[in-house]
């Protein structure tokens, strides 16, 4: 389940110049490939991005923000705050505010102050992540499962937040079906703490399903009209996944940067992160805005599947992760629970095709591993949202030619 398709062969690094000095690293790859190349700075970057690029349209790189939640002068997204305690108790006003947030922004905070036990488990998982990700690479690669839903994935396996550079995060994943099954594909470290991960992920699952239930209620779905819950049957296979990410502290940009712009594949994403770096593409005001971390809050966002199932009513917002300065100056940790519909769920995608939830999942992960140039030709990475909303600056960035950084303005996008 969630295995990488054999068609995912293309890589951004296939376009390396012949004189590129490179390093070899065991990495997430097609089964027929034993290694990948990492670009060295002598080919493309002098040392790091020049300071004058800090105001680049579509690629804000403001001064480094601390890890706490104080306002640091960064351009912040104005997101609604939904109180989980009120929502689960059936507060009508809170349900209406939830519907409005999904309609208008597709992103909102979920206040979890009513769940102290869950917040304690969050700290326990962060402690686990700190220990796991600081193992040697060889040890972590033993958990590589060649899968997009379980196992370990090293840095630099997909395109990053800057043109010509790969991503710079590593991850450890555990699918819901595996956690509740025999666990044969789980990393041994996850199996050792399976009680924690089951309790932690089950609580997130309970909350996102409750959000779907409230949306069904607000829209009057049910009866003869299939509800959102109907596409998340307990007895159906799905690619719902718990993902743990680390964006390592870096000294240079030569190995990659951030997490490329995209919309999420599934129904709802439940995100926990206490550090800056997440940006959402806002409609009003138009442009990239940081999602400020809030203690005791999760960030919930609508995914492509829920947008399609809602008849394109809900907004699946484009987002990315990028350092608040040119480099990631400290390890950044985030946890995401990706709720995904049953594999056999059918919907009409942004191109007008009738596809299954599994097909959309597999195709989109393949596009993640394409080059930036190829991604710009396809609507799937951002779910067609960049064309639907016609927001300026989504493709703006940096082009690196002959070792020199060139600014791309709106006229180049």
UniProtKB/Swiss-Prot annotation:
Its EC number is 1.14.-.-. Residues 235-341 form the Fe2OG dioxygenase domain. It comes from the Eukaryota. InterPro entries: DIOX_N, IPNS-like_FE2OG_OXY, IPNS-like_sf, Iron_ascorbate_oxido_reductase, Oxoglu/Fe-dep_dioxygenase_dom. Pathway: Secondary metabolite biosynthesis; terpenoid biosynthesis. The keyword Oxidoreductase applies. Viridicatumtoxin and its derivative, viridicatumtoxin B, exhibit anti-methicillin-resistant Staphylococcus aureus (anti-MRSA) activity. Moreover, viridicatumtoxin and a C2 acetyl analog, spirohexaline, have been demonstrated to inhibit bacterial undecaprenyl diphosphate synthase, a potential new target for antibiotic development. GO terms for molecular function: metal ion binding; oxidoreductase activity. Pfam families: 2OG-FeII_Oxy, DIOX_N. Keywords: Iron, Metal-binding, Oxidoreductase. Gene3D superfamilies: B-lactam Antibiotic, Isopenicillin N Synthase, Chain. GO terms for biological process: terpenoid biosynthetic process; viridicatumtoxin biosynthetic process. Coiled coil: none annotated. The keyword Metal-binding applies. 2-oxoglutarate binds at residue 332. Oxidoreductase; part of the gene cluster that mediates the biosynthesis of viridicatumtoxin, a tetracycline-like fungal meroterpenoid with a unique, fused spirobicyclic ring system. The first step of the pathway is the production of the malonamoyl-CoA starter unit for the polyketide synthase vrtA. The aldolase vrtJ may be involved in the synthesis of the malonamate substrate for malonamoyl-CoA synthetase vrtB. The polyketide synthase vrtA then may utilize the malonamoyl-CoA starter unit, followed by sequential condensation of eight malonyl-CoA units to form the polyketide backbone. This is Oxidoreductase vrtI. It comes from Penicillium aethiopicum. The gene is vrtI.
